[in-house]
């Protein structure tokens, strides 16, 4: 290798390079390919195709051009990717069954609802639809920003100045890296009515918006069964709607029942549907059908399903809905780019983003038109000067040797201006950039270079033929226009009035009737009713991967067993939170920033032990650098129950459970955290319980719950335990009272690396406390061994912290018949019977609970109630 090559090589860490490069790739896919912009509803490839067709004059009033020509123009100038990707985009924009409002007018074979492929691009021809021009209007009036194309030679718009809320009108779908979008199409009349309602009342609610926009409107029509999923999607940005084929049971001329299918759910392949029904008939999975015939033609869809004499048509139809794509679930996930950042939008936010875009477009257009109008009035003033002094002007031009000399002579002197023009002159018409010494000065007029150039551009016969009346008329019209533009720019009311007028024009020109019928929720499928109730293990990893597995996946082992893998982890990842819940429970997810989010257990991904699950950031709308630090299962929100929260810094807070009974898509503030503190535990109480806080230095404080008053959501809480400031563990169990977090003593700085709260326990009944340490040791100690103290004391020793044990990682209350689960940072999980763990005093080291490798540590402990004492449970040797 030569020295020059060697000197140009820079060593990099391959792991960091892979992370960085993959992140760059992911953002490129998200921003540059897969997600639409919330403002114009288009992905980059759609925007570039339409922009190219507009630049080439391939508009609705021109003749068709070959698709190959458009594709070549797009990939050559704006979109340096494969021609098939661009042609597929053009094809989809020309298919009446794909887009609610087609943007491309195609001539030739563009495929069919049966899944037939379109003809090659050399055979088909295209031009823009009339409605497409509404997306491109005012593009040349500096209404949007432009960016260089891939080679820097041309400029392409970042977004189109659309007058149509295309994201809702045509919807969008796409899969990016780590996120996806699926937005259904809507009726343009209804969406524009919603926009107009928002303009009239910015604080309009989503319920009020739904009076104008009742639901999606698919190009294939069909039926939407029920409104529940629509309402959820419009409120949260995510939801599911059930779309059914339009099918009726009729009696034919032979007196036999037939099911007539005339409309299909959106994106359902008709040929595959017919094939699937025929397959179900052959396999006898559907009874009562004697024949199926597809009689569809260019007039519309018609599938005839003949019913046997002894069958009931409605029953057969219900079977078809449940077993075929005659009923499908359309999962709504309204993710779009908001100025380059991916975001989940609800219905109102999408409309708001579109109206704000229109405000910017109209404002920028008005600024552009104002500048052009002022430039024109300025030129008209110059022409009026020339007309008023025509003889002198002609003499100067004739006596000048060249154009430059004439220009200098004309601009170096003052001129008189006709009194009719002087009376019309208005300061609002003066260009902003015009020098102060130019224009009207007293009764004299000084021409600018632009005016002189305009005069010299005229041929002599045109200069002498200037009609003074026409100049005055045009000047007056421009003054009226300038006044209106200034009014638009200075008045928010006038600006919104212009937006309203333009939206009403679009509605009058392109609005149409709804195609999709929204029916009552009869026969609506409740997803929760379809989910079997079972106990599951929910795990959340340090890297934020969440999943659940059936509890039966884990067999009990003797203590000291090696365990089995609970999940497949990356080298730097490990299970951080583990709990047992029912599939119908709600998981309250508390974040590192003190925010609370809601999830149903069945909404989590179900995965095997070997799978990592799904990143929780793809499920919850977490903010930047926010992570989930505590999770709590809730079956019902009872009025006499409370949620107790504890932080690593020793703060406790009590809040009524009903405060958390109204799930919000973006979460709420549950606890105001201080400094570097974070939430470590939550539990539900009845107001008369006791609270136990266990520290990593092996101490515990137990105090009455009524020592902590119920607080509001925004409160910080009070001090629960006095943590150690050094690694020296003292046996001093004396108490020092600190009444409130605001006391000066409570402000002492704490190092959570030295000591922190690791577990919150709300003891119930008698039982015992099982404590586990980093190195896999632990013990059981009767609850009666732990004395009740005041809150904010040092507490008492719960377990000896030693080199063998390591620090305490968790503690939990257990019963004799329970089992426990221990998880390590290597992803190993062991499940063992509590009865096999010895009961000893507080001030002891305990026994081995799980065998760990030298560099492996226990990170979590979870109790499993009512263990099955089946003798067949897997066993393994134990060792103390």
Curated annotation (Swiss-Prot):
Family matches, as PROSITE patterns: TOPO_IIA
Motif (GyrA-box): 557-563
GO biological process annotation, one example: DNA-templated DNA replication
CDD domains the UniProt entry points to: TOP4c
EC number per UniProt: 5.6.2.2
Keyword Transferase: no
Alphabetic keyword roster: ATP-binding, Cytoplasm, DNA-binding, Isomerase, Nucleotide-binding, Topoisomerase
GO cellular component assignments: chromosome; cytoplasm; DNA topoisomerase type II (double strand cut, ATP-hydrolyzing) complex
Substrates-to-products reaction catalysed: ATP-dependent breakage, passage and rejoining of double-stranded DNA
Subcellular location: Cytoplasm
Record: active site: 123 (o-(5'-phospho-dna)-tyrosine intermediate)
Keyword ATP-binding found: yes
MF GO annotations: ATP binding; DNA binding; DNA negative supercoiling activity
Pfam families from the UniProt entry: DNA_gyraseA_C, DNA_topoisoIV
Chief localisation class: cytoplasm
Note: Few gyrases are as efficient as E.coli at forming negative supercoils. Not all organisms have 2 type II topoisomerases; in organisms with a single type II topoisomerase this enzyme also has to decatenate newly replicated chromosomes.
Role of this protein: A type II topoisomerase that negatively supercoils closed circular double-stranded (ds) DNA in an ATP-dependent manner to modulate DNA topology and maintain chromosomes in an underwound state. Negative supercoiling favors strand separation, and DNA replication, transcription, recombination and repair, all of which involve strand separation. Also able to catalyze the interconversion of other topological isomers of dsDNA rings, including catenanes and knotted rings. Type II topoisomerases break and join 2 DNA strands simultaneously in an ATP-dependent manner.
Complex formation: Heterotetramer, composed of two GyrA and two GyrB chains. In the heterotetramer, GyrA contains the active site tyrosine that forms a transient covalent intermediate with DNA, while GyrB binds cofactors and catalyzes ATP hydrolysis.
Family: Belongs to the type II topoisomerase GyrA/ParC subunit family.
Protein name: DNA gyrase subunit A
Lineage: Bacteria, Pseudomonadati, Pseudomonadota, Gammaproteobacteria, Pasteurellales
Gene field: gyrA
């Amino acid at each position: 290798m030569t020295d020059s090559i060697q000197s140009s090589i820079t060593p990099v860490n391959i792991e960091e390079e892979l992370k960085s490069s993959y992140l760059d790739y992911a953002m490129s896919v998200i921003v540059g390919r897969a997600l639409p912009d919330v403002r114009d509803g288009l992905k980059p490839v759609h925007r570039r195709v339409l922009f190219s067709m507009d630049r080439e004059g391939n508009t609705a009033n021109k003749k068709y051009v070959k698709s190959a020509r458009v594709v070549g123009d797009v990939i050559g100038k704006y979109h340096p990717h494969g021609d098939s990707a661009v042609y597929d985009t053009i094809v989809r924009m020309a298919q009446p069954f794909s887009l609610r409002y087609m943007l491309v007018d195609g001539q030739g074979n563009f495929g069919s609802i049966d899944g037939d492929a379109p003809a090659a691009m050399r055979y088909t021809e295209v031009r823009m639809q009339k409605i497409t021009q509404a997306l491109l209007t005012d593009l040349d009036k500096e209404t949007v920003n432009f960016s260089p194309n891939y080679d820097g030679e041309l400029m392409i718009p970042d977004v189109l100045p659309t007058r149509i809320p295309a994201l809702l009108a045509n919807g969008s779908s796409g899969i990016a890296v780590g996120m996806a979008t699926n937005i259904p199409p809507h009726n343009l009349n209804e969406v524009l009515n919603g926009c107009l309602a928002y303009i009239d009342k910015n604080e309009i609610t989503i319920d009020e918006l739904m009076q104008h926009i009742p639901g999606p409107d698919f190009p294939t029509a069909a039926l939407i069964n029920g409104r529940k999923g629509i309402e959820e999607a419009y409120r949260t940005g995510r939801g599911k709607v059930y779309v059914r084929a339009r099918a009726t049971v009729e009696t034919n001329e032979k007196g036999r029942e037939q099911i007539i299918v005339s409309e299909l759910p959106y994106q359902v392949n008709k040929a595959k549907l017919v094939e699937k029904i025929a397959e179900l008939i052959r396999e006898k999975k559907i009874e009562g059908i004697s024949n199926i015939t597809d009689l569809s033609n260019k007039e519309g869809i018609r599938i005839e399903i003949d019913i046997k004499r002894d069958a009931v048509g409605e029953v057969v139809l219900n079977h078809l809905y449940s077993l075929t794509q005659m009923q499908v679930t359309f999962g709504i996930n309204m993710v779009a780019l908001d100025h380059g950042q991916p975001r989940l939008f609800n219905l109102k936010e999408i409309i708001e983003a579109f109206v704000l875009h229109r405000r910017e477009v109209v404002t920028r257009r008005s600024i552009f038109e104002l500048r052009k109008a002022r430039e024109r009035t300025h030129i008209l003033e110059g022409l009026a000067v020339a007309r008023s002094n025509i003889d002198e002007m002609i003499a100067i031009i004739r006596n000048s040797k060249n154009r430059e000399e004439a220009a200098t002579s004309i601009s170096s002197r003052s001129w008189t201006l006709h009194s009719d023009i002087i009376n019309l002159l208005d300061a609002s018409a003066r260009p902003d950039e015009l020098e102060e010494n130019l224009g009207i000065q007293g009764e004299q007029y000084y021409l600018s270079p632009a005016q002189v150039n305009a005069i010299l551009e005229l041929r002599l016969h045109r200069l002498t033929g200037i009609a003074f009346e026409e100049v005055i008329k045009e000047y007056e019209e421009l003054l009226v226009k300038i006044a209106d533009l200034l009014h638009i720019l200075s008045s928010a009311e006038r600006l919104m009035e212009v937006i309203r007028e333009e939206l009403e024009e679009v509605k009058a020109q392109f609005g149409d009737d709804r195609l999709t019928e929204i029916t009552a929720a009869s026969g609506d499928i409740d997803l929760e009713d379809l989910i079997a109730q079972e106990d599951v293990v929910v795990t959340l990893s340090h890297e934020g991967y969440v999943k659940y597995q059936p509890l039966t996946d884990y067999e009990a082992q003797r203590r000291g067993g090696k365990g089995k893998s609970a999940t497949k982890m990356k080298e730097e990842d490990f299970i951080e939170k583990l709990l047992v819940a029912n599939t119908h429970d709600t998981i309250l997810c508390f974040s590192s920033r003190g925010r609370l989010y809601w999830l149903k257990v069945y909404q989590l991904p179900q995965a095997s032990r070997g799978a990592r699950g799904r990143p929780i950031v793809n499920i919850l709308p977490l903010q930047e650098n926010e992570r989930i630090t505590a999770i709590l299962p809730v079956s019902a929100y009872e009025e006499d129950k409370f949620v107790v929260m504890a932080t690593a810094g020793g703060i406790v807070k009590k809040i009524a459970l009903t405060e958390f009974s109204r799930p919000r898509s973006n979460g709420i503030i549950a606890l105001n955290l201080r400094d570097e503190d974070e939430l470590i535990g939550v539990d539900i109480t009845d107001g008369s319980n006791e609270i136990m806080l266990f520290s990593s230095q092996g101490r515990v404080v137990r105090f009455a719950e009524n020592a902590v008053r119920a607080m509001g959501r925004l409160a910080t809480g009070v001090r629960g335990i006095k943590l150690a400031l050094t690694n020296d563990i003292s046996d001093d169990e004396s108490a020092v009272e600190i009444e409130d977090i605001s006391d000066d003593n409570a402000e002492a700085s704490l190092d959570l690396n030295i000591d922190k709260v690791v577990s919150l326990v709300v003891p119930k009944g008698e039982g015992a406390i099982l404590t586990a340490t980093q190195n896999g040791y632990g013990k059981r100690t009767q609850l009666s061994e732990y004395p009740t103290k005041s809150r904010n004391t040092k507490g008492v020793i719960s377990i000896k912290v030693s080199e063998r044990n390591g620090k305490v990682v968790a503690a939990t209350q257990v019963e004799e018949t329970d089992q426990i689960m221990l998880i390590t940072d290597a992803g190993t999980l062991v499940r063992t019977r509590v009865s096999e763990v010895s009961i000893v005093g507080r001030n002891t080291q305990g026994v081995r609970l799980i065998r760990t490798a030298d560099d492996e540590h226990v990170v979590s402990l979870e109790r499993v109630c009512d263990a099955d004492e089946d003798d067949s449970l897997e066993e393994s040797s134990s060792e103390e």
